[in-house]
Amino acid sequence: MTVKCANDLDTHTKPPFVARMIHRFAVPIILVWLAIAVTVSVFIPSLEDVGQERSVSLSPKDAPSYIAMQKMGQVFNEGNSDSVIMIVLEGDKPLGDDAHRFYDGLIRKLRADKHVQSVQDFWGDPLTAPGAQSNDGKAAYVQLSLAGNQGELLAQESIDAVRKIVVQTPAPPGITAWVTGASALIADMHHSGDKSMIRITATSVIVILVTLLLVYRSFITVILLLFTVGIESAVARGVVALLGHTGLIGLSTFAVNLLTSLAIAAGTDYGIFITGRYQEARQANENKEAAFYTMYRGTFHVILGSGLTISGATFCLSFARMPYFQTLGVPCAVGMLIAVAVALTLGPAVLTVGSRFGLFEPKRLIKVRGWRRIGTVVVRWPLPILITTCAIAMVGLLALPGYRTNYKDRAYLPASIPANQGFAAADRHFPQARMKPEILMIESDHDMRNPADFLILDKLARGIFRVPGISRVQAITRPDGTAMDHTSIPFQISMQNAGQVQTMKYQKDRMNDLLRQAENMAETIASMRRMHQLMALLTENTHHILNDTVEMQKTTSKLRDEIANFDDFWRPIRSYFYWERHCFNIPICWSFRSIFDALDGVDQIDERLNSIVGDIKNMDLLMPQMLEQFPPMIESMESMRTIMLTMHSTMSGIFDQMNELSDNANTMGKAFDTAKNDDSFYLPPEVFKNTDFKRAMKSFLSSDGHAARFIILHRGDPASVAGIASINAIRTAAEEALKGTPLEDTKIYLAGTAAVFKDIDEGANWDLVIAGISSLCLIFIIMLIITRAFVAAAVIVGTVALSLGASFGLSVLLWQHILGIELHYLVLAMSVIVLLAVGSDYNLLLVSRFKQEIQAGLKTGIIRSMGGTGKVVTNAGLVFAFTMASMVVSDLRVIGQVGTTIGLGLLFDTLIVRSFMMPSIAALLGRWFWWPQQGRTRPLLTVAAPVGLPPDRSLVYSD
């Protein structure tokens, strides 16, 4: 009795219809695909051009940061896109008036351009200029909002328009204007990715050419394989370009790069599968046609399953929310379906035509003894082999906990691109975060332009500023990022004493006048005391005068009486003197007449003396009374002088105290101002009427006053794990600051670099879960359909998942721990999905061969399968791995990291999983590997084969 294998049972099986049609119409098939390739290459723009034309926005539309950015643009009338760039002015000396004139001219041109939606002109306003200029004074910047979202064609056109304006505006000597920012970086990333495509393709072709020459040792065979791969790649790229050009799908530079590499690598793999299986059949003494059909039966389902797996897994990326991943889904899926269609038709057709001329004949025997020995070792000691492979996998798995991602896009782009040069210029003068700020906006239901709400806004700004990792917060209450001058309550209190301080000198002078007045009063008191003494003497003299006058009056009265007697007796004679007409001329007459007239005056004197005596009596009565008034008057004046001196002394002390208080208040106010202390902010109502302040409010408050925004700068790089982690802290700080205030119910929006990357990180994690689970389910279903064995399909998926973790760990070990470069945040999702897809190819091919050889028994079938597929699968895996690793020559380091990660995964999957882990698991599980099918652990015993039966081809191979 002999063992009869499945291949012998299928020797006379009727070939499949599709295989027969391809074999019959090989030349027309080649011509059709060639015509299609020429058509899509000539009449449809290149994939790179279409990628620029149909470049989609890379911002997730449902992300909170994107919604916040849109809301801010709407509220502040600054546009409806998320495309923001910076223009940095750098001088070799502090920027002066010539720089300001250049800047003003640049701003005028930018405002007039249709691509510029808004300009945040901080440096042009003296109130906000310090916040936009570096500490050394040699650099300043302006922020622009442009038309088009990041990654879109309109955004790239807008950036080109801004750069054109900057180039066409002559700068003063020593001053350079740089266009930079996140949007400019993305635009340059697209340009770099597209320019690198030729280099990646050329490198891939060289790698494939060298590898295939080493494998086949036939230049013609390699050229025909490359011809097939070229047609596959051209048609796949052309069809995707057609779909993109007609607007049916969107593209990104990642999709263009990955699709090209996948199409080339997968096409080469399929060519190796086809050629290897054909040569294997030819060495088994099958004729060319029989070998063709054997090849088709052995590879059709593998290539179809592989293509469906890759296209299905990449299509699962369409379920992702992140445009970075979403744009990979349909283009890569369509491209791979086209590549599979070409591989299943053009590849066999080229093989058919080439085989007619002997171009695909093996140049040497396929060496299988080494792989059979490996198979023998595996089936003999499956558990130790499995443990060993798991230990090898642990090398990568143990590196996973130390995985650190990086969100700093500029670090993964060439330093020579314009945006990176602008960032480098900014880094020379500004902190890293200055070009990548966070913006927080609150929106209330009322106008916040009042002192009460400004207290809350400043409290909010202070709360955010106190978040660990935040270095600066610019707001209407702190336009330059620090507490506004003269807005502290102590300073305003000190300003209230300004008028008092100004009048203090005059008040002290008037107090000094009181001192002089007291001195004058002292002199007056002394005079009054002297006058009192004199008045006492005068009173005494007056009394004496009165006595003397009374005596005199008595004497005069007596004299009058005596003269009256004399006059009476002498009257007749007297009359004579008055009768004489010529008395005046007679001397004796006139003299006697004058004597008698004088005697008449004695009577008048007596009357006057009587009157004088009365007056003197009154004076004698009044003078004592008047004298009595002087002591109280002197006492009163002395009291007044004492009070005046006391007032002077008291007020001098009060004024000194007031002076000290004023000095303390002024010192305190100056100290609060100098220290930029923001604990006691207050703006009086009159400030809101100030023209300069109104102009500043336009930058931080909406036109209706219902919204206010805050520009937040990190202490370190916002595109870091710490920067992203601070976003929740910022939002929490804002909520806590508003809690219990009239603005408690306001809506909070947060956008910016760290906010965007936080959304990307969370979205990428969810997208990875969604795409990963859907891909695993899809792969499992495809494997289940092809293998018809639940356990086998589960083992394939399980080993792929294990290989995935180990492969990514090896990439972490290589890039992070050996090269010192952290993996970009996009690498994980992109490489994982692709590895899920391509990692199952070789396991599927091996398991399919297990199924073909199962009639020889499980262990024998494993040995034969490994002997028959070992070299082919290894070659295919190496070519695929090296092709994907060729992406490392891209200017985009992230593309290189994705390629090397996939390459490492393919190497691990080819050399470890497919060669040792998968067959050892199959050997351990035995017949349960094929559950629910009935696996055969022993060879099928049949009647001996008749004479002339072709020998078992699995036994004719030799080294």
Swiss-Prot record:
**Keyword list, A-Z:** Cell membrane, Membrane, Transmembrane, Transmembrane helix, Transport
The organism's superkingdom is given as: Bacteria
Residues annotated as transmembrane: 25-45, 205-225, 239-259, 300-320, 333-353, 381-401, 766-786, 790-810, 818-838, 872-892, 902-922
Q: What Pfam families does the database record attribute to this sequence?
A: MMPL (PF03176)
Its subcellular locations are: Cell membrane
The UniProt entry, under InterPro entries, shows:
MMPL_dom, MmpL_fam, Mycobact_MmpL
Please provide one cellular component term from the Gene Ontology annotations of this protein. plasma membrane
| UniProt topology in membrane | Multi-pass membrane protein
Q: Which family does it belong to?
A: Belongs to the resistance-nodulation-cell division (RND) (TC 2.A.6) family. MmpL subfamily.
State the name under which the record lists this protein. Probable transport protein MmpL4
Q: Please report the organism this UniProt entry assigns to the protein.
A: Mycobacterium leprae (strain TN)
